[in-house]
Swiss-Prot record:
The gene is dusA. This is tRNA-dihydrouridine(20/20a) synthase. FMN binds at P19, M20, L21, Q71, K140, H173, N213, G214, G215, G235, R236. It catalyses: 5,6-dihydrouridine(20) in tRNA + NADP(+) = uridine(20) in tRNA + NADPH + H(+); 5,6-dihydrouridine(20) in tRNA + NAD(+) = uridine(20) in tRNA + NADH + H(+); 5,6-dihydrouridine(20a) in tRNA + NADP(+) = uridine(20a) in tRNA + NADPH + H(+); 5,6-dihydrouridine(20a) in tRNA + NAD(+) = uridine(20a) in tRNA + NADH + H(+). Belongs to the Dus family. DusA subfamily. One of its GO terms (molecular function) is tRNA-dihydrouridine20a synthase activity. The active site is at C101. The lineage of its organism: Bacteria, Pseudomonadati, Pseudomonadota, Gammaproteobacteria, Enterobacterales. Its EC number is 1.3.1.-, 1.3.1.91. The keyword Metal-binding does not apply.
Length: 332
């Protein structure tokens, strides 16, 4: 069973926010949750090594974040199974295996997109996790790697991981990945998008649940993809222009609600900010995720500038945001 949202008959995976390294941390996810009650949120990729050997609590999250999925990076079935059990015990709603990140530091650890070249190992990893948890185990991948970019290669990968790994849900980034020669940023922009190939994959594997990811910039585009796919995952646009999430519950999930007011969202962050600051957090680490909230609204530039210049100062607290809001209110 996939996690369902609290107030909708539609599954949470219908619309999700992509796992993004250095971006979708727990502060970011708490903020995004205030914009949409329904959207499925993903953590940044967390490696099995960090969870098993790291000194920090890499599984920390706020209860308010649900539904929330943990994305794991790794390629050792036993270690992945161990981490999946820990994550389920902590209350995560889904475990996702990263088979799409092309970063050099990821390849060196033998996980991410390079795993696409070893479908049997991916199947073994998924099966090991499925055997020890009852929550969904999903895979996020690309449509190919390097010169292994034929449709037959992609189908063989899906066949192996769904058949032998018993994976029932895939999130497909509609680009291939170059494992050398391109930076992670270039790998998100240079390989061309091929949405029709992902649509065809869903038609050829109708029994599997599939979400599409890559280059999606509006809810209108998301709704078009949902004519072909089970779910849509949005990445950079949702981070850089989070205001688009204000209408997700109504437009994507059919909820009988009014769209979220961004000013109210900012003020709803104040108790969280006060709590985090009291535990040693730094305001700038929270507000950096909120800079794009008013994109397209008069005063947005002043909002960004004020936060950027003041959130890092000693003693900065929620009053900084309240002052920044006046720059928006003056323009409304």
């Amino acid at each position: 069973m996939q996690p369902e949202t609290q107030s909708s008959a539609l599954p949470a995976y219908r619309f999700s926010i992509a796992p993004m390294l250095d971006w979708t941390d727990r502060h970011c996810r708490y903020f995004l949750r205030l914009l949409s009650r329904q959207t499925l949120l993903y953590t940044e990729m967390v490696t099995t090594g960090a969870i098993i050997h790291g000194k920090g609590d890499y599984l920390a999250y706020s209860e308010e974040e649900h539904p929330v999925a943990l994305q794991l990076g790794g390629s050792d079935p036993a270690q992945l199974a161990h981490c999946a059990k820990l994550a389920e015990a902590r209350g995560y709603d889904e475990i996702n295996l990263n088979v799409g990140c092309p970063s050099d530091r990821v390849q060196n650890g033998m996980f991410g997109a390079c795993l696409m070249g070893n479908a049997q190992l991916v199947a073994d990893c998924v099966k090991a996790m499925r055997d020890v948890v009852s929550i969904p185990v999903t895979v996020k991948t690309r449509i190919g790697i390097d010169d292994q970019d034929s449709y037959a290669f992609l189908c063989d990968f899906i066949n192996t991981v769904s058949g032998q790994g018993e994976c029932e849900m895939f999130i497909i980034h509609a680009r291939k990945a170059w494992l050398s020669g391109l930076s992670p940023k270039e790998n998100r922009e240079i390989p061309p998008l091929d949405y029709p190939r992902v649509y065809q994959l869903k038609r050829d594997f109708p029994h599997l649940t599939m979400s599409i990811n890559g280059g999606i910039k509006s809810l209108e585009e998301a709704k078009e993809h949902l004519r072909h796919m089970d779910g849509v995952m949005v990445g950079r646009e949702a981070y850089q222009n989070p205001g688009i999430l204000a209408a997700v519950d109504r437009e994507i999930f059919g909820a009988d609600t009014t769209d979220t007011d961004p000013v109210a969202v900012v003020r709803a962050m104040y108790p969280y900010i006060e709590r985090e600051l009291s535990q040693g957090a730094y305001l700038g680490h929270i507000t950096r995720h909120m800079l794009g909230l008013f994109q397209g609204i008069p005063g947005a530039r002043q909002w960004r500038r004020y936060l950027s210049e003041n959130a890092h100062k000693a003693g900065a607290d929620a009053a900084v945001l309240e002052q920044a809001l006046k720059l928006i209110a003056d323009k409304r």
